[in-house]
């Protein structure tokens, strides 16, 4: 049982593409789903001045973002980081006043690949599919020489891509051969999207490959050129930063520190010092302080013309609705009134995965681990391992190493095995690769069943049906989150804020001068 009370506080300060539009104080926005997408939509609605309600069926907010703290360990049960080159997550973090809590990966070697039975270093400059540096690619032991020679034929193969969408795997095999697909593209791209490379959509997942073939013909030429441009831009930024730092230092001490060091390329990944759950906690606290109605243990039965029908019998009057509860939930709620959109959503396949967290004392290892983990190109039940306490600071007590092992359903049935069988198989799999002895001091199993949308061939067409149906028939409703427009944390946040703006603007356009008749509805609910 809890009580949500409305208090008056300033709305968040936002800028750029997320800047508030026309005043929405007469608009009631209902957000279905209290994961990161739903909370970000609520944050944007609050910034617009709208009355906002968030309805979550679970007993907590955050969805797949769950941070568990116990015995000195910080265990992420869902995502553990986000990419910094997509700004939506960092922007939201700044608005929440958490910028000083952002951390980057620490020391330790970069990710390795389990290929042909051995852990091998990822070649420097390797992107998700293609190399951005030639020599590390030529000398890598991940690929055999026949695989490298076949990949090199891309330099002379003519353009072959059809106008329609195709599987990434089929396209890459045609240009680069099977080796680079199995050893690089499938573990890296498939690992992110929870699907095999031979079912993932080129146009939805890696549309830049189509552009590269059109503009350069050779994918290798395009990638190497892009790598050179990126390194040149990085050097220019570093020179500018050094000049600014030297100028500041010289002004204060009279000395010139012009000699610099050339370090490794910065990681694109970021997280929060207290885990990604810190982001959820801050959102919930500030939304509650801003008067947003936050409901847990409450599901939505129906989207009606009179409002949002809740499982407890209440009806929330709604001028605008953002559906952020996932593919299955959104399809169910749209089906009575928008069957075409519901069918398109239901056609998006969903993947399952299990995360097994393990911790050993450093003394249990033959050699103290210094790698941030590995991906697996070889066949087997595990897709990869992340050494959480090496990747990010503050994840384990001194003298311990915390790791997360990923067991997706695309790798076989082990993900659904009983806990004892799953745990035994995972430990037996990673033990010889880690050189670790004894039983782990911490074990934790987190199962995510049918929650990861797979962007298979034709995904953009399915997404277009959903978007166009809503725009034409229910412009004050939107579907947001990982189902349609991107699976990463920044993608979900950006989509949520854009969706909130769209439905609020549509509601204001429908009744531009009419105050919300339900504005006086009691904002305090006890459950």
From Swiss-Prot:
Free-text remark on how the cofactor is bound: Binds 1 FAD per subunit.
Protein name per Swiss-Prot or TrEMBL: Coproporphyrinogen III oxidase
Residue numbers spanned by region Disordered: 1-23, 231-267
Gene Ontology cellular component list: cytoplasm
Binding site for FAD: 33-38, 56-57, 64, 78-81, 300, 448, 487-489
Reactions catalysed: coproporphyrinogen III + 3 O2 = coproporphyrin III + 3 H2O2
Subcellular location: Cytoplasm
Main location: cytoplasm
Family indicated by similarity: Belongs to the protoporphyrinogen/coproporphyrinogen oxidase family. Coproporphyrinogen III oxidase subfamily.
The enzyme's E.C. designation: 1.3.3.15
GO molecular function: oxygen-dependent protoporphyrinogen oxidase activity
InterPro entries named among the record's database cross-references: Amino_oxidase, FAD/NAD-bd_sf, Protoporphyrinogen_oxidase, Zeta_carotene_desat/Oxidored
A biological process from GO: heme biosynthetic process
Names of required cofactors: FAD
Pathway connected to this protein: Porphyrin-containing compound metabolism; protoheme biosynthesis
One of the Pfam families matching this protein, by short name: Amino_oxidase
Compositional bias annotation for Low complexity: 1-14, 236-252
Keywords of this entry: Cytoplasm, FAD, Flavoprotein, Heme biosynthesis, Oxidoreductase
Function: Involved in coproporphyrin-dependent heme b biosynthesis. Catalyzes the oxidation of coproporphyrinogen III to coproporphyrin III.
């Amino acid at each position: 049982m809890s009580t949500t009370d409305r208090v008056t506080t300033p709305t968040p300060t936002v800028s750029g593409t997320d800047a508030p539009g026309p005043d929405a104080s007469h608009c009631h926005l209902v957000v279905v789903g209290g994961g990161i997408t739903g909370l970000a939509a609520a944050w944007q609605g609050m910034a617009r001045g709208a009355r906002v309600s968030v309805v979550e069926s679970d007993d907590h907010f955050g969805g797949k973002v769950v941070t568990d703290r116990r015995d000195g360990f910080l265990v992420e049960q869902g995502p553990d980081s986000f990419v910094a080159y997509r700004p939506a997550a960092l922007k939201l973090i700044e608005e929440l006043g958490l910028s000083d809590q952002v951390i980057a990966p620490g020391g330790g070697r970069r990710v390795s690949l389990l290929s042909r039975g051995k852990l091998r270093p990822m070649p420097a400059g390797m992107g998700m599919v293609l190399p951005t540096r030639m020599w590390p690619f030529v000398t890598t032991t991940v690929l055999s020489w026949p695989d490298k020679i076949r990949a090199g034929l891309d330099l002379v193969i003519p353009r072959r891509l059809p106008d329609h969408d195709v599987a990434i795997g089929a396209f890459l095999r045609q240009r680069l051969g099977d080796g680079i697909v199995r050893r690089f593209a499938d573990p890296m791209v498939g690992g992110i999207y929870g699907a095999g490379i031979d079912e993932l959509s080129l146009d939805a997942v890696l549309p830049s490959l189509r552009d590269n073939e059109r503009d350069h013909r050779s994918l290798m030429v395009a990638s190497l050129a892009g790598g050179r441009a990126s390194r040149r831009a990085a050097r220019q930024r570093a020179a500018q930063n050094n000049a600014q730092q030297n100028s500041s230092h010289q002004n204060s001490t009279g000395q010139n520190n012009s000699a610099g060091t050339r370090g490794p390329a910065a990681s694109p990944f970021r997280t929060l010092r207290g885990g990604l759950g810190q982001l959820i906690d801050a959102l919930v606290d500030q939304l509650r302080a801003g008067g947003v109605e936050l409901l847990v243990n409450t599901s939505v039965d129906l989207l009606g013309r009179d409002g949002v029908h809740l499982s407890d019998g209440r009806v929330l009057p709604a001028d605008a609705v953002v559906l952020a509860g996932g593919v299955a939930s959104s399809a169910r709620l749209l089906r009575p009134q928008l069957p075409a959109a519901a069918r398109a959503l239901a056609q998006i396949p969903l993947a399952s995965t299990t995360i097994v967290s393990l911790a050993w004392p450093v003394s249990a290892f033959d050699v103290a681990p210094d790698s941030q983990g590995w991906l697996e190109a070889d066949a087997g039940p595990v897709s990869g391992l992340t050494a959480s306490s090496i990747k990010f600071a503050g994840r384990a007590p001194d003298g311990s190493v915390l790791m997360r092992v990923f067991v997706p359903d695309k790798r076989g049935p082990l993900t659904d095995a009983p806990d004892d069988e799953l745990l035994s198989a995972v430990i037996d799999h990673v033990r010889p690769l880690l050189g670790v002895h004894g039983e782990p001091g911490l074990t934790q199993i987190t199962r995510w069943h049918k929650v990861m949308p797979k962007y298979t061939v034709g995904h953009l067409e399915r997404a277009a049906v959903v978007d166009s149906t809503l725009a034409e028939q229910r412009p004050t409703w939107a579907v947001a989150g990982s189902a349609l427009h991107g699976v990463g944390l920044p993608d979900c946040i950006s989509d949520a804020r854009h969706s909130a703006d769209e439905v609020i603007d549509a509601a204001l356009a429908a009744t531009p001068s009419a105050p919300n008749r339900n504005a006086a509805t009691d904002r305090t609910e006890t459950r």
